[in-house]
Amino acid sequence: MTIRLLPPVLVNRIAAGEVVERPASAVKELVENAIDAGASRIDITMTDGGRARILVVDDGRGMDPGELSLAVERHATSKLPGDDLLDIHTLGFRGEALPSIGSVARLTLTSRAAGAGDAWALTVEGGAKGEPEPASHPQGTRVEVRDLFYATPARLKFLKAPRTEQMHAVDVVHRLAMAHPAVGFTLSDGTRQQIRLSGAQGELFEARLTRLGAILGREFSDNAIAIEAEREGIRLTGHAALPTYNKATSAGQYLFVNGRPVRDKLLHGAVRGAYQDVLAHDRNAVLALYLDLPPEMVDVNVHPAKAEVRFRDPGLVRGLIIGALRHALAAAGHRASSTVSLAALGALRPAQGSGAPALPWGAGGYGGGASHPGLEERRSAYAAQAPAGTPDPWAGRGMGAGGGSGQAAMAWLAGAPPAAPRLAGEPEAPPTGAEDFPLGAARGQIHDTYIIAQTRDGVVIVDQHAAHERLVMERMKAALAERGEVARQILLLPEVVELDEPGAVRVATAAAELAKLGLVVEGFGPGAVVVREVPALLGDTDVKGLVADLAEGLAEWGTAQALEDRLGDVVATMACHGSVRAGRRLRIEEMNALLRDMERTPRAGQCNHGRPTYVELRLGDIERLFGRR
């Protein structure tokens, strides 16, 4: 077969196979054209998931008859003032979208240029172009696509159900709306409006957060921290959710480069690196990041649908993202997402039909009026059996601010021994003013695991092990950053730890790196190592358990060389073993010291595995649980 030139219609259909993969692809191209035309409002309507009809109407600059005719010609565009493909300041630049769509569908364009007295319409069917004709239309452009893929029916077999195709279009419009908050968007399926976004006003940073909240939900905007950094001409802005607000997949991660939504593996790798010691391995951060950089530093012409880009210096971009995210997370301090408290409140709400009797809201009981019979019985029984002089814990409205004798009485009622009286010279509970601290004043400990603290307007419940684990880890990281190693303490009796032979070899091979972290180990024959020094921060730790966990981690992380890149994981493992354990009873002053350390420590809102370290319940929410509000 001899080589021949393909006819223009076939060329356009081949291009359409790359550019217009599905109805959402056509929506993307048409909406990008509208944004490039300076539109402040874009309305999209889809019928039958876009198969039957796609309508995009904008109020942009519009086109005159000559431009209208050129717009449907292949590689005709107004967006490249020169011949430099690296000097691109618009979303579109190839001039492929309209001719590609027109080659596989019935396309009608109606447009009126700014300042023009008349509108013009042009039709393209299966690649056959008509002539511009006078029409009626306000300033802007109206693009109607009917019978998508009618000229290439084989493509229709690959489309999903109409609802699925509609959802793909919703995702496309959401991404473009995040990138351009000043533009208003609507998307309808002909019967129901699925997107309605007004153009956000004011400063760009706040406008973006408003738009993100409208799309990702109020929970995201309530739990988002601002990201802002710049390095070597690259500016990074955006918002990232606190680690305790996360998702099971990376679908909640959005990257925009010079206003263009892109999907880039670089983003996911950088985000994972930034969140590695504050997020569980099976959870993913939620964020939207905006990169603004000179056009010559990024190539946007590497993907048919322009969904991917290539950076001239990907290492610089990755470092900027990781550094900015880590700095913002550290600046957030002990803050945890509101979803943690909401989840706790949801678990506390009495379930209708459960075995426990439920009080009607606002009826009797704890707020005055007729008391609950069960409480009256318990109060009478308590008065008859309690030791003489023990105060009535039900007297007044609560147990008292300091959790003193009333607390002891309640402990006795629960079967626990009363709290020992304070000895001479023993520190008193913190003054009432301690409630003004962000995490409040410690009032007690339950199950020797959870610290109960009272704030000015609520209650904080702290997981003492998770919280101390984060404190130890941050101290070790700070020591590494300042001195290059962690202070060590010599064991009076070296500890011999038996492992399987491969595990012992892995630990012994990593001895130099582990020594920087304060753990001095040596090989001790086949299947064993001897530990001579441990990090001083860990105190009295379970050496055998620590080394066993490190051996398992090294099997997952790889060689000792790879260990240098996984120091965060090693430090997290050590911190876990060196922290206050669940089941250890603490004194009030120890609890308060832990709370104050949390307030001063970055990333203290979550442990090294990404779990929350505390839950805060507002007084108003607690009162609603008991029908007081």
Curated annotation (Swiss-Prot):
Pfam families: DNA_mis_repair (PF01119), HATPase_c_3 (PF13589), MutL_C (PF08676). The keyword Hydrolase does not apply. GO terms for biological process: mismatch repair. Disulfide bonds: none annotated. PROSITE patterns: DNA_MISMATCH_REPAIR_1. One of its GO terms (cellular component) is mismatch repair complex. Keywords: DNA damage, DNA repair. Signal peptide: none annotated. The keyword DNA damage applies. InterPro entries: DNA_mismatch_repair_CS (IPR014762), DNA_mismatch_repair_MutL (IPR020667), DNA_mismatch_S5_2-like (IPR013507), HATPase_C_sf (IPR036890), MutL/Mlh/PMS (IPR002099), MutL/Mlh/Pms-like (IPR038973), MutL_C (IPR014790), MutL_C_dimsub (IPR042120). It comes from the Bacteria. HAMAP family: DNA_mis_repair. Belongs to the DNA mismatch repair MutL/HexB family. This protein is involved in the repair of mismatches in DNA. It is required for dam-dependent methyl-directed DNA mismatch repair. May act as a 'molecular matchmaker', a protein that promotes the formation of a stable complex between two or more DNA-binding proteins in an ATP-dependent manner without itself being part of a final effector complex. NCBIfam families: mutl, PRK00095.2-4. This is DNA mismatch repair protein MutL. The lineage of its organism: Bacteria, Pseudomonadati, Pseudomonadota, Alphaproteobacteria, Rhodospirillales. The gene is mutL.
